[in-house]
Amino acid sequence: MAVSESWTKKYLAEVLGTFVLVFLGDSFVAFAVAGAGGNGFKAGLLGAGFFWGFAVTLAIYACGAVSGAHLNPAVTLSLAWRRGFPWSKVPGYIGSQIVGAFIAAMGVSFVWNGIIVHYEVASKIVSRGDPNGVTSGLIFWANWPHPGLVGYTGDYLTQDPWWRGAGTEIIITAILVICILGIVEDRMPSAANLAPIAIGFVVAALVGLFAPIEMASLNPARDIGPRIWGLLIGYGSNAIPGQNFNLWVTTGMPLIGGPLGAWIYDFFIHQHLPAPVGPDTVPVAESARARA
């Protein structure tokens, strides 16, 4: 399929792709936290990793042929810095990703509202803006530290200091971008149509392993878009700026980790790859290369 040269179509494709990603991912979290009688966390964090990875794969297939399926401001910044993506288009892509995530949060709130409310009643959440309201808020956005595991009052913040959450987010987002650039590397023989599956596996591994620390945001749009929606439906400061201003960890740190990962990949791998020669070298399709 030919990639459209219309940037408007690319922006709309990013909206759609990010919607698919966040709607499917957050729907699983809603099931895991609020499902099964409101007892919460029925499917576990490994299940969350699997479904978020699956959501990434489907989202890339959904919009990659038009927009390249960045789906993530950290990826867009990385491609602009290291792969020649136009800087003038970065705000449009990031804005589209945030809009898609915001609409997805609205959709999750609509579809799962009854179950979420039942969970809040069972958990004695009187107001979503109260400290314990953060446990239903994590359905929509990432949170440092993970309130479902370490709690939301007392000394839970000292048990998991900010620098650990920030460092974790930088490291895992760097790993994400390193793997993406390797998967879609155009100087290595590669099956372009399998790139979305491979990228989905990367996300599944990172979320499954590191969500216990700070829910493995990896994606500023996936975080800030639903937080804006949360602000509108009563979560107050639990949404923005988050308890102990944790938004800067889950939204801000991936913007450092992504470009850092791109630089690391180029320094250690990309510059050392041989130039493609001969008919046996199969370049990755443009759509897959941009999917990063």
Per-region residue spans from a language model:
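Membrane-interface helix-loop junctions and terminal tails of multi-pass membrane proteins
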Residues: 1-292
